[in-house]
A protein has these predicted regions:
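Non-catalytic terminal and boundary segments that flank Rossmann-like NAD(P)-dependent oxidoreductase
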Residues: 1-30
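Conserved glycine-rich Rossmann-like NAD(P)H-binding loop of the short-chain dehydrogenase/reductase
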Residues: 51-69
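Short, conserved SAM-binding/catalytic segment
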Residues: 67-81
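NAD(P)H-binding glycine-rich loop region in Rossmannoid oxidoreductase-like domains
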Residues: 86-124, 135
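Conserved Rossmann-fold NAD(P)-dependent oxidoreductase catalytic core, especially the SDR/UDP-sugar
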Residues: 104, 130-152
């Protein structure tokens, strides 16, 4: 399991030092696309932060595939600081809690899907991002949007 890898833990430790300086007094964060490379690392980093810091951040981790979440995050599925949301972004956000910060990493970035269905792929990514922005606007949250080079 990646979480138990010594090198991975060392990397989390180094990134943790940087994270302490940028989190400030934030108390809650929603991360979308948590089964992707960047999103899964960010969730592990926030869990590491909560385990090693004297303050706790409430983490909301969102992805559409419950099975992938359970496989990737089996080490934290029962962690009280992490709340998993199983949702596709083709619908409005189903998180009633207020979050201060949203890191939006979810998108349909599969080249094969884009090649077959370019318009619907683009529209789905736009619609998902719009739902994130609406949710943020209604709750006064800040949004950080990042993606791979494969987003359309």
């Amino acid at each position: 399991m990646l979480w138990e890898n010594k090198l991975y833990q060392e990397d989390l430790g180094e990134t943790y030092e940087y994270l302490k300086s940028i989190l400030g007094e934030r108390k809650s964060i929603l991360v979308t696309g948590v089964t992707g490379l960047i999103g899964s690392y960010l969730i592990d980093l926030l869990v590491y932060y909560n385990r090693n810091s004297n303050r706790k951040i409430k983490v909301y981790a969102m992805a559409r595939n419950e099975k992938k979440i359970q496989e990737r995050f089996s080490h934290i599925c029962k962690n009280d600081d992490v709340h998993f949301i199983y949702q596709d972004l083709s619908e409005p956000i189903q998180c009633e809690d207020t979050v201060e910060w949203i890191v939006h990493l979810a998108s349909n970035a599969d080249p094969k899907t884009y090649a077959q269905f370019p318009i619907s792929t683009i529209l789905m990514n736009i619609e998902g991002t719009n739902y994130i922005l609406e949710y943020a606007k209604n709750r006064g949250a800040k949004v950080l949007f990042a993606s791979t080079m494969e987003v359309y």
